Protein backbone atom coordinates (compact mmCIF):
# COMPACT_ATOMS: atom_id res chain seq x y z
CA UNK A 1 0.00 0.00 0.00
CA UNK A 2 1.50 3.28 -1.14
CA UNK A 3 -0.95 6.18 -0.93
CA UNK A 4 1.60 8.73 -2.14
CA UNK A 5 2.19 6.67 -5.29
CA UNK A 6 -1.23 5.33 -6.14
CA UNK A 7 -3.78 7.83 -4.79
CA UNK A 8 -3.74 10.85 -7.08
CA UNK A 9 -5.09 13.55 -4.83
CA UNK A 10 -3.68 16.99 -5.81
CA UNK A 11 -0.67 16.97 -3.50
CA UNK A 12 0.41 13.50 -4.63
CA UNK A 13 -0.35 14.15 -8.29
CA UNK A 14 2.03 17.11 -8.44
CA UNK A 15 4.88 14.97 -7.13
CA UNK A 16 4.04 12.03 -9.39
CA UNK A 17 3.98 14.32 -12.41
CA UNK A 18 7.73 14.77 -11.97
CA UNK A 19 8.12 10.98 -12.04
CA UNK A 20 6.00 10.68 -15.19
CA UNK A 21 8.05 13.28 -17.04
CA UNK A 22 11.30 11.59 -16.00
CA UNK A 23 9.94 8.25 -17.19
CA UNK A 24 8.93 9.71 -20.56
CA UNK A 25 12.37 11.26 -20.98
CA UNK A 26 14.01 7.91 -20.28
CA UNK A 27 11.65 6.17 -22.69
CA UNK A 28 12.54 8.68 -25.40
CA UNK A 29 16.23 7.94 -24.87
CA UNK A 30 15.66 4.18 -24.93
CA UNK A 31 13.26 4.20 -27.89
CA UNK A 32 15.99 4.28 -30.53
CA UNK A 33 17.39 0.96 -29.33
CA UNK A 34 14.14 -0.92 -28.74
CA UNK A 35 13.77 -4.01 -30.98
CA UNK A 36 10.08 -3.23 -31.52
CA UNK A 37 11.20 -0.27 -33.63
CA UNK A 38 12.59 -2.05 -36.68
CA UNK A 39 14.36 -0.71 -39.79
CA UNK A 40 14.28 -2.67 -43.04
CA UNK A 41 16.65 -1.12 -45.57
CA UNK A 42 16.07 -2.11 -49.19
CA UNK A 43 15.65 0.31 -52.09
CA UNK A 44 16.74 3.69 -50.69
CA UNK A 45 14.89 5.67 -53.34
CA UNK A 46 11.72 5.37 -51.30
CA UNK A 47 11.07 4.80 -47.60
CA UNK A 48 7.99 4.41 -45.44
CA UNK A 49 7.48 5.15 -41.75
CA UNK A 50 4.53 3.10 -40.59
CA UNK A 51 3.16 0.85 -37.84
CA UNK A 52 0.54 -1.77 -37.13
CA UNK A 53 -1.58 -3.17 -39.95
CA UNK A 54 -0.48 -0.36 -42.26
CA UNK A 55 2.96 -2.02 -42.35
CA UNK A 56 1.42 -5.07 -44.04
CA UNK A 57 -0.10 -2.87 -46.73
CA UNK A 58 3.29 -1.31 -47.44
CA UNK A 59 4.97 -4.72 -47.72
CA UNK A 60 2.24 -5.97 -50.03
CA UNK A 61 2.24 -2.97 -52.35
CA UNK A 62 5.96 -2.12 -52.37
CA UNK A 63 8.03 -5.00 -50.93
CA UNK A 64 11.20 -3.45 -52.38
CA UNK A 65 10.84 -0.21 -50.39
CA UNK A 66 12.76 0.59 -47.21
CA UNK A 67 10.57 0.60 -44.11
CA UNK A 68 10.80 1.88 -40.56
CA UNK A 69 8.21 -0.10 -38.61
CA UNK A 70 7.37 1.60 -35.34
CA UNK A 71 6.38 -0.48 -32.34
CA UNK A 72 6.55 2.42 -29.88
CA UNK A 73 4.64 5.54 -30.92
CA UNK A 74 4.88 7.59 -27.75
CA UNK A 75 7.53 8.72 -27.42
CA UNK A 76 8.81 8.32 -30.98
CA UNK A 77 12.41 7.21 -31.60
CA UNK A 78 13.70 10.55 -32.87
CA UNK A 79 17.28 9.55 -33.67
CA UNK A 80 16.14 6.43 -35.51
CA UNK A 81 13.62 8.41 -37.55
CA UNK A 82 16.13 11.13 -38.42
CA UNK A 83 18.71 8.56 -39.55
CA UNK A 84 16.14 6.73 -41.64
CA UNK A 85 14.88 9.94 -43.23
CA UNK A 86 18.42 10.98 -44.15
CA UNK A 87 19.09 7.72 -46.02
CA UNK A 88 16.01 7.58 -48.25
CA UNK A 89 15.29 9.87 -51.17
CA UNK A 90 11.52 9.99 -50.77
CA UNK A 91 9.85 9.57 -47.40
CA UNK A 92 6.22 8.64 -46.84
CA UNK A 93 4.45 8.43 -43.51
CA UNK A 94 1.71 5.86 -43.84
CA UNK A 95 -0.68 5.98 -40.86
CA UNK A 96 -4.43 5.67 -40.72
CA UNK A 97 -6.68 8.50 -39.53
CA UNK A 98 -5.02 11.42 -37.70
CA UNK A 99 -1.43 12.43 -38.64
CA UNK A 100 0.03 11.77 -35.19
CA UNK A 101 3.46 10.55 -36.34
CA UNK A 102 3.55 12.90 -39.33
CA UNK A 103 3.04 16.05 -37.28
CA UNK A 104 5.81 15.11 -34.84
CA UNK A 105 8.24 14.19 -37.62
CA UNK A 106 7.62 17.45 -39.46
CA UNK A 107 7.97 19.37 -36.20
CA UNK A 108 11.53 18.01 -36.05
CA UNK A 109 12.24 19.70 -39.38
CA UNK A 110 12.00 16.64 -41.63
CA UNK A 111 10.11 18.42 -44.36
CA UNK A 112 10.65 15.78 -47.04
CA UNK A 113 8.05 13.63 -45.27
CA UNK A 114 4.82 13.21 -47.22
CA UNK A 115 1.70 11.97 -45.49
CA UNK A 116 -1.80 13.35 -45.49
CA UNK A 117 -1.02 15.43 -48.57
CA UNK A 118 -1.72 12.27 -50.56
CA UNK A 119 -3.22 9.81 -48.06
CA UNK A 120 -6.75 10.18 -46.73
CA UNK A 121 -7.63 10.92 -43.10
CA UNK A 122 -10.85 8.90 -43.39
CA UNK A 123 -11.53 5.20 -43.47
CA UNK A 124 -9.23 2.21 -43.67
CA UNK A 125 -6.03 2.03 -45.70
CA UNK A 126 -5.05 -0.70 -48.14
CA UNK A 127 -2.25 -1.83 -50.41
CA UNK A 128 -4.24 -0.43 -53.32
CA UNK A 129 -4.11 3.04 -51.77
CA UNK A 130 -0.31 2.95 -51.94
CA UNK A 131 -0.36 1.68 -55.51
CA UNK A 132 -2.68 4.50 -56.50
CA UNK A 133 -1.18 7.44 -54.58
CA UNK A 134 2.53 6.55 -54.65
CA UNK A 135 2.95 4.48 -57.81
CA UNK A 136 0.22 6.24 -59.79
CA UNK A 137 -1.32 2.98 -60.91
CA UNK A 138 -4.84 3.00 -62.26
CA UNK A 139 -6.60 0.12 -60.59
CA UNK A 140 -8.84 -2.16 -62.57
CA UNK A 141 -11.06 -3.91 -60.10
CA UNK A 142 -13.35 -6.70 -61.24
CA UNK A 143 -16.97 -6.01 -60.30
CA UNK A 144 -18.08 -8.00 -57.31
CA UNK A 145 -20.31 -10.97 -57.94
CA UNK A 146 -23.95 -10.03 -57.76
CA UNK A 147 -25.35 -11.41 -54.54
CA UNK A 148 -28.70 -10.73 -52.93
CA UNK A 149 -28.62 -7.79 -50.53
CA UNK A 150 -28.79 -8.85 -46.91
CA UNK A 151 -29.15 -5.78 -44.69
CA UNK A 152 -28.77 -6.23 -40.93
CA UNK A 153 -31.94 -7.02 -39.03
CA UNK A 154 -32.95 -7.62 -35.43
CA UNK A 155 -32.72 -11.25 -34.34
CA UNK A 156 -35.85 -13.42 -34.67
CA UNK A 157 -37.82 -13.27 -31.45
CA UNK A 158 -36.11 -10.09 -30.25
CA UNK A 159 -38.56 -8.06 -28.10
CA UNK A 160 -37.35 -4.86 -29.76
CA UNK A 161 -39.26 -5.95 -32.85
CA UNK A 162 -42.57 -6.01 -31.00
CA UNK A 163 -41.97 -2.62 -29.41
CA UNK A 164 -41.00 -1.02 -32.71
CA UNK A 165 -43.93 -2.62 -34.52
CA UNK A 166 -46.36 -1.07 -32.05
CA UNK A 167 -44.64 2.32 -32.22
CA UNK A 168 -44.76 2.19 -36.01
CA UNK A 169 -48.48 1.42 -36.04
CA UNK A 170 -49.12 4.30 -33.65
CA UNK A 171 -46.94 6.59 -35.81
CA UNK A 172 -44.68 7.33 -32.86
CA UNK A 173 -41.18 8.73 -33.45
CA UNK A 174 -38.24 7.51 -31.37
CA UNK A 175 -35.02 9.12 -30.22
CA UNK A 176 -32.68 6.14 -30.38
CA UNK A 177 -29.46 5.16 -28.69
CA UNK A 178 -26.39 3.00 -29.26
CA UNK A 179 -27.03 -0.72 -29.51
CA UNK A 180 -28.50 -3.34 -31.81
CA UNK A 181 -31.86 -1.63 -31.36
CA UNK A 182 -30.54 1.23 -33.51
CA UNK A 183 -31.75 -1.02 -36.35
CA UNK A 184 -35.18 0.39 -35.57
CA UNK A 185 -34.20 3.24 -37.89
CA UNK A 186 -34.36 1.10 -41.04
CA UNK A 187 -37.15 -0.69 -42.88
CA UNK A 188 -39.46 -2.33 -42.18
CA UNK A 189 -39.60 -0.86 -38.66
CA UNK A 190 -38.57 2.74 -39.50
CA UNK A 191 -39.22 4.20 -36.06
CA UNK A 192 -35.96 5.76 -34.86
CA UNK A 193 -35.36 9.23 -36.31
CA UNK A 194 -32.24 10.29 -34.43
CA UNK A 195 -29.23 8.59 -32.83
CA UNK A 196 -26.14 10.49 -31.70
CA UNK A 197 -24.09 8.79 -28.99
CA UNK A 198 -24.42 6.62 -25.88
CA UNK A 199 -27.05 7.95 -23.52
CA UNK A 200 -28.27 10.71 -25.84
CA UNK A 201 -31.79 9.42 -26.47
CA UNK A 202 -33.30 10.77 -23.26
CA UNK A 203 -31.38 14.05 -23.30
CA UNK A 204 -32.21 14.56 -26.99
CA UNK A 205 -35.90 14.27 -26.24
CA UNK A 206 -35.50 16.60 -23.28
CA UNK A 207 -33.70 19.11 -25.48
CA UNK A 208 -36.47 18.94 -28.07
CA UNK A 209 -39.05 19.67 -25.40
CA UNK A 210 -37.05 22.64 -24.12
CA UNK A 211 -36.52 24.05 -27.60
CA UNK A 212 -39.87 23.31 -29.24
CA UNK A 213 -42.29 22.75 -26.38
CA UNK A 214 -44.29 19.78 -25.14
CA UNK A 215 -46.65 19.76 -28.11
CA UNK A 216 -43.72 19.08 -30.43
CA UNK A 217 -42.77 15.85 -28.68
CA UNK A 218 -46.25 14.53 -27.89
CA UNK A 219 -45.67 11.66 -30.34
CA UNK A 220 -42.03 10.97 -29.43
CA UNK A 221 -40.42 8.46 -27.07
CA UNK A 222 -36.83 7.73 -26.07
CA UNK A 223 -35.52 4.21 -26.67
CA UNK A 224 -32.47 3.05 -24.71
CA UNK A 225 -30.94 -0.29 -23.70
CA UNK A 226 -29.91 -1.30 -20.20
CA UNK A 227 -26.13 -0.95 -20.55
CA UNK A 228 -26.41 2.35 -22.38
CA UNK A 229 -28.85 3.57 -19.76
CA UNK A 230 -26.31 2.81 -17.02
CA UNK A 231 -23.52 4.39 -19.08
CA UNK A 232 -24.91 7.93 -19.38
CA UNK A 233 -28.63 7.62 -19.99
CA UNK A 234 -29.36 7.56 -16.27
CA UNK A 235 -27.81 11.01 -15.92
CA UNK A 236 -30.28 12.45 -18.42
CA UNK A 237 -33.22 10.85 -16.64
CA UNK A 238 -32.03 12.16 -13.27
CA UNK A 239 -31.73 15.63 -14.76
CA UNK A 240 -35.30 15.50 -16.05
CA UNK A 241 -36.58 14.33 -12.66
CA UNK A 242 -34.71 17.14 -10.95
CA UNK A 243 -35.99 19.86 -13.28
CA UNK A 244 -39.60 18.71 -13.22
CA UNK A 245 -39.83 18.17 -9.46
CA UNK A 246 -38.08 21.35 -8.31
Question: What function would you assign to each model-found segment?
Answer:
Residues 216-231:
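A short, small-residue-rich loop immediately preceding and capping a beta-strand
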Residues 56-59, 101-103, 163-166, 183-186, ...:
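Short helix/loop capping segments that flank catalytic or ligand/cofactor-binding pockets
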Residues 51-58, 198-213, 237-240:
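Structured alpha-helical segments in the cores of large, soluble enzyme domains
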Residues 81, 234-237:
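Generic hydrophobic/aromatic pocket-lining and core-packing "Φ" positions
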Residues 244-245:
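Conserved small/polar residues in nucleotide/adenosyl-binding loops
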